[in-house]
Amino acid sequence: MTESSAQLDEAASTNKLSLHGRWLGPLFSVLLGCGLMTQTEMPVPAIATACIVVLMAGWWITEAIPLAATAMLPLALFPLTGVGEKVATAPVLNQQVTWDLDHPRFGAPLVLDIKSNGQRQGSGMMIDIHNQHGVVRSETSQTSVPLAYIRAAKPASLFEVTSRSYASKFVFLMMGGFLLGLAIERWNLHKRIALMTILTLGTQPRRLIGGFMATTAVLSMWISNTATTVVMLPIALSLIVLMREKNPQVDHIRLNNFAACLLLCIAYSASVGGLGTFLGTPTNLLFRDILDQNGIEISFGQWMAFGLPSAFIFLIIIWYLMTHVIFRISLPEFEGGRELIQSELRKLGPMSKPELTIAALFTITALLWITRSFFTKWAWLQEIYPNVIYIDDTIIAMTASLLLFVIPALGHPGKTLMDWKTANKLPWGVLLLFGGGLALASAVKTTGLGAIICEAVTPSGATAILIIMFVVTTAMIFMTEVTSNTATAALILPLLVTLAGNLDVDPKLLLIPATLAASCAFMLPVATPPNAIVFAAGQTTIRQMVRAGFVLNLVSIVLLPLLTYIIGQLVFGF
């Protein structure tokens, strides 16, 4: 896969679109800047941010340079253009300034009086609380806040301000999740889970497809959708070959339809399965971080309470449409399928001690993620261990991933569950892309660019929120057919937060369907890595993928806002 990916990257960088994008992006960016400077009274930082957004969007869409390299543009361009200066500037004496807090108990923005002696008073202070509707409520607090909890106690360089996004706690949460996934892959636990699940669900063709979808979706919730598809593809191809050998009397068109349906279902369930957890796809964590920047917290367990039933409902619909409507699978019982799966399991041998250890560690980690919002609030536990209040999902992920380097791989002398050779397979480009998206989101908010754009596009009069949700979902789905879903989400989600404020609605109503839609591009091979992987196998045509994908895109446009509105209401209480 590494060699193939390198060849694809090289081809992408030399095609005409990429070459044109390298100079068209800067050209449009400069022209936009000149136009805004002469025709509007926008603040200079907002104009600079708009130009950088256009440049990054153009380079992301055309892949003029590698996506991760484009994601690093804020590190150079934000300091050079003064973006972030407001955040970096220290408060002057006798001035009220709003600061963010690291302390979990005082997480809301805090107004501090800077006294002449340089002391920041914590008693009787005023706390500014911004709710999801943008309304400000002021409360007084008699509890002192230690100075150590206040960020940016002195002026920071603009590079330092920008680079904070690349070291966001959610970047490290993603890194911890990737390391756990790599450990599962290293010891072949994911393949064993896949084979056992398929064996359990049976080998009748429609049920077999359902088994592959269920297995792929579950794996994709915890390891990358690319790795999941790579694991499932050879198993599926072996079954397809065996089915053709065992059923020579069956019309080859029906067999070809089964093959195409099976592989497309694997690709689609890899994308949809990622909706179930925050770790399933980078866009989920990007959504969480953007809400976190706006004072709204969603726990790992809360998202699973919403994501799991949503993904399950979506998978059932995809399975039914693919097997009963689009491809109409009607084949006899798969003769020899069970024997093939059992043969593959025998090749793996009995479950090894490292597999058992990783399974136990992963289970404990997942349980801690799900229950963290509860046990950190237990009074008796706080008395025994006061620092429990500082535990968050990132600390859990990093602790578990570091333990992988410490816990010995029993039965393999001198080895631990994880080594650096395996860890170095981390998708560093994805982490940089995620950090760049966060930097962009922060700049759009702090410079006021988001407010300016959303004020211009906010519909006048009473517009049903469901209609806006459908429009947002539609735009996101078809944009991500041809662009990176993480890059697109990084551009769009910050604007939706401001738009929600202008409309006086909960921002989650717009952000959730947009986030889900970013993972639901089903039509083209370039839309997602799973689509590209199964298309490269040669068992499905572009026409089949476009036909099936277009139907599922239409279903997504209707389904995702409804899932958000119905299940989201129960979980998040809009």
Provide a role label for each language-model segment.
Residues 2-38, 175, 186-192, 225, ...:
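Juxtamembrane and boundary regions of transmembrane helices in multi-pass small-molecule transporters
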